[in-house]
């Protein structure tokens, strides 16, 4: 075991057990601790790769940094009922094949809180671990190009965990594989690839998170019964930028989210896969996106109600020659609705309809989207609307659109306006 480097003067190491114990390394302190003991090392930087295999409390409140020295995973936790808190973990190895991380967890009912993980390949790697709590963890894996980063948090066959109040920046993905009933709440995730990515992971809840400047905000791939509510999903730009995406996923409940400033606000690639379990989108603000909702094909089983579609360059896009006529549209607000409300009941008296005129050029030939927003395509669209060369295709229809956004989604009543979210 390599010796540690400490900023503390003196040679006596204190540990809170039944009484003070002298030890040569942090690993020695941990190994000497009885089950349930609290280990409080002196302040300093300990250059070691630590293994915790019994249920202690490791508290770095004095100012403890554990440095992996660029080798392997910094801390390996293979036990149940342990607590790690008030620590800094840094400088893991850099081998993707070994998944070198700041912290590896394999166990149940552990609590990891108030920990900073920096300059590591992966942040936290969690395997076959249930009922753990990860709270107030800061993960900054380093200013690497995106393709050289590891995942901030990787969850593998792990259920009933809580991830709360964490701050993640400049990592690759927060990815959940084959895991159920996890709660991801009140986290800040910035400048990654997938903010949160579910793979074959069912019945998880994502709420009150702020996900900004990622390539993709939240993506569900073969993941059913996911709940997304009260999240801010902002500024997923680039050619493949997606706010919320689905791939063959069913039974999602997407409520009260702000999906603002993305290339594609919502992306649906045949979802729901199970026709008996529709996806529900209710009370969302879908604003200032390049495309509000993109359907990869003509599909059915998605129900949209009480949403506000505001200043999207294109409200709805269906690739190829399909339509969104089989989807459910009920009581949404569309800011480009040109109808009227003669009886003043708040509901438009004529349907909201989207027809494809010149737009179908870039919808059917994606490379033509280069000209979208330009004078030539705008002029062609105007002429098509004035005197169509051929019958335009009806893309979608809502029979009872709202004249104004639902009360909760009125910009003046929101904590932040949609424009402020873009800044």
Predicted stretch roles:
Residues 21-51:
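Acidic Gly/Asp/Thr-rich repetitive segments characteristic of extracellular carbohydrate-active
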Residues 46-57, 66-110, 121-129, 155:
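Extracellular beta-strand-rich solenoid/capping regions of secreted or surface-exposed proteins
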Residues 41, 60-65, 87, 115:
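Extracellular beta-strand-rich, repetitive "passenger/adhesive" scaffolds
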Residues 1-12:
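Bacterial N-terminal signal peptides that target proteins for export
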Residues 68-76, 96-104, 119-125, 141, ...:
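Extracellular beta-strand/beta-solenoid scaffold signature
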Residues 237-239, 243, 252, 265-274, ...:
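Functionally critical loop-and-helix segments that line ligand-binding/catalytic clefts
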